[in-house]
Amino acid sequence: MSAILSADDLNDFISPGVACIKPVETLPPKDTKNQEDAYEVTTEDKVQPEDLPPAQISLTDCLACSGCVTSAEAVLISLQSHAEVLNTLDAHPEIPLTHEPHGVGVNNTEDSKEGKIFVASVSPQVRASLATTYGISEKEAGYMIDQLLSGPQGLRGGGKHGNGFTWVVDTNAMREAVLVLTADEVSDSLNSGESSAMSQSDDSLPKRPILSSACPGWICYAEKTHPFILPHLSRLKSPQALSGTFLKTVLSKSLGVHPSRIWHLAVMPCFDKKLEASREELTDMSWRQGDSSGSESQPVRDVDCVITARELLSLASSRGSSLRDLPLQPLHSSFNPPFPEKTLDSFLSLKRSRAEQSLATGTSGGYLHHVLMTFQARNPGSELVVNRGRNVDVVEYVLMSPEGQPILKAARYYGFRNIQNLVRKLKPARVSRLPGAKPAVRPAAGRRQPMSRNAVSTGSSGSDYAYVEVMACPGGCTNGGGQIRVEDARETLGPSQGESLDASMKPSPHEQRAWLARVDEAYFSMDSESESELETQSQLLSLADKEAKIHERLRSWSEYMNIPLSKLVYTTYRKVESDVGKDQTPANDTSRVVELAGKIGGGW
C-alpha cells in the first residue's frame, strides 16, 4: 500500500477549506480615529475589545464560496434540522381546510390569516433505510412516516398548536417525470445534428456527454472546482426540486395562498440536499411571473427544509413519539385529505413496478437505465453490452444495432474518486499561447493505468458518451450520508432486538457492507399485494404509452398554472468564485466599481 494512504482517506467526504468567506474569528479593526499617528505602537493589552455580533454562516453563503468543495455536515445539520421543523410547527398555526364540492378549500378563520400549510415529500431511499432499521417492508416504512408526520400519534400529539403535515407525497412521482424528460433531453441532444460535443451551438441543450444533475454534492463540486463541466450538466430539476415546484405552484393557486405560506419539508438520504434546497435558482422567482403586488418581495424556496433519515429519528424522539409503536397502516381519511386539484392528483399517484425498480436501475433513481431502455425500445433488435469498470461504481453501456454498430454509449460513475477520473477525461485540451500552435492532445487516461481483463476501455476521451449518471456517494443514494447507520440502529433499537454486539462498538467494514446490502434489498423490494395490481397496469402500457401519459400530465400542469413548462422543470447552474486570496484593498475595490460603472454606461 502506498505510504500516502491512510485510514482517513477511505471515504469520499472532502473537508471544508480553511479559507472561508465567513470567518468565525475576527481581527481587531484598524483604529481610524488617529490616522495621523501612523507610527504609534499599540500593545495587545491596550486594544479595546468590541461587542461584535456572532458570526452566522448560511447555506447560501456556502453556495457562494469556493473555499470548500462540500460543506461540513455540522453546518448543514445546524441550519436545517429536526429542530427547525419543530420550531416552525410551533411558530405558526396550521391553516384549516374545508371539504367543498369541487375539492378542498381554505377555511377563512384567524388561523388562516397567520398560519401555514405544511407539506412533505419523502424519497424511497429513506423508506428503505427505515425498513431495514425496523425490519419491516418498504411500504410499511412509508406508512410509518405518514403516521409520524400526519397522524394523531405522531407530531400532532404534541407542540404548541398540535400541527402536522397535511400532505405527504412520494418523490417517485416526480422522478417518473424527470426520467421521461431525461430521455427527451438525450434524444434532442443526439438529434441536434452535431456529432461533436464541442461543436454543439444550441445553448438550450447541454453539451454531450450529458451529465446527470440530481446529486447536489456532485453539482457543488462541479460549480466550485470544474466550471468547464457546467455546459454538460442536465438542465432538469431533481425530483426533490420538482416536487417542491409542483406542490408550491398547484397549492398556492388552488387554495389562493401565497407560496410563502406553504412550508415544504423534504426527507432525503443526503445532507447535501440541504444545499440544493438553498439554491437561489430553486425559488418561486424562477416560475412566478408578473406578481409584483403585495409586500412579498423575497424569493420563496420551493423546498423550505430538508432532513435526513437519521434526523427523522431525532424528530420523533424530540416529540416523544416512538416510531416502532406507530400504526403500520394507511392514515385515516380525516388526516389524509384529497389533493385540491383533482386533474393533477393523478400526478402524485405515479408509482414504479418491480420491473422498473430492479438491480439494473441502480439505487439512485434509474436515470441511466431509463435512457437505455427508451433507446432500446426505439431500436428493435438492438442489444445492450455491459462493460464493468475497475470497481463496481463504474459501468459502461453500449447499445448495439443488429448489424453490430453502436447506437448509444453511456456510463455510470459513482463516488468522488471515480468522478475525478471522469472529469479528467472531459477536461478540454490546453490551448497553446504560441501563435499557430495546435492544441495539446490530452491523454485519454491522464496517467499510466494498468488494464484489467474486465475493465472499461480508457481509449475514449469520454466525449463519445451520450449520457453519464453521476452520483457522489459510492454505491448510490441508498448509501447517502444521512441514512441510518448500523450504530444508529443499535442505539435506536436497543439490546431487546437481539443485538449481541455492544451498541458503542464501531461496526466492521463487513457489517457496514451487509447493512448497505439490506438497505438495497429493501429499496428494490415491493409489497406483494401492490405488486400484482401495479404489474397488471404496467403490462398494459408500453414504454411509449407511459411517456405519452406523463407528457400529458406535464402539459396539464403547465396549462393549469399558465406557465411555460420550461420554467417549471428546468434550472440553471453557475460558476462559483470567491474573493479569497484576491486583492481586497480599497484601491482595487474602487477600480472594480469604476469598471462596472463604465460597462453599464455610468461614471462620474
UniProtKB/Swiss-Prot annotation:
Keywords: 4Fe-4S, Iron, Iron-sulfur, Metal-binding. GO terms for molecular function: 4 iron, 4 sulfur cluster binding; iron-sulfur cluster binding; metal ion binding. [4Fe-4S] cluster 1 binds at C20, C62, C65, C68. Residues 451-461 have a biased composition (Polar residues). It holds the Pfam family Fe_hyd_lg_C. GO terms for biological process: iron-sulfur cluster assembly. InterPro entries: Cytosolic_Fe-S_CAF, Fe_hydrogenase, Fe_hydrogenase_lsu_C. The keyword Iron applies. It comes from the Eukaryota. Residues 434-461 are annotated as: Disordered. [4Fe-4S] cluster 2 binds at C215, C270, C473, C477. PANTHER family: NITRATE, FORMATE, IRON DEHYDROGENASE (PTHR11615). Belongs to the NARF family. Component of the cytosolic Fe/S protein assembly machinery. Required for maturation of extramitochondrial Fe/S proteins. May play a role in the transfer of pre-assembled Fe/S clusters to target apoproteins. This is Cytosolic Fe-S cluster assembly factor nar1. It comes from Penicillium rubens (strain ATCC 28089 / DSM 1075 / NRRL 1951 / Wisconsin 54-1255). The lineage of its organism: Eukaryota, Fungi, Dikarya, Ascomycota, Pezizomycotina.
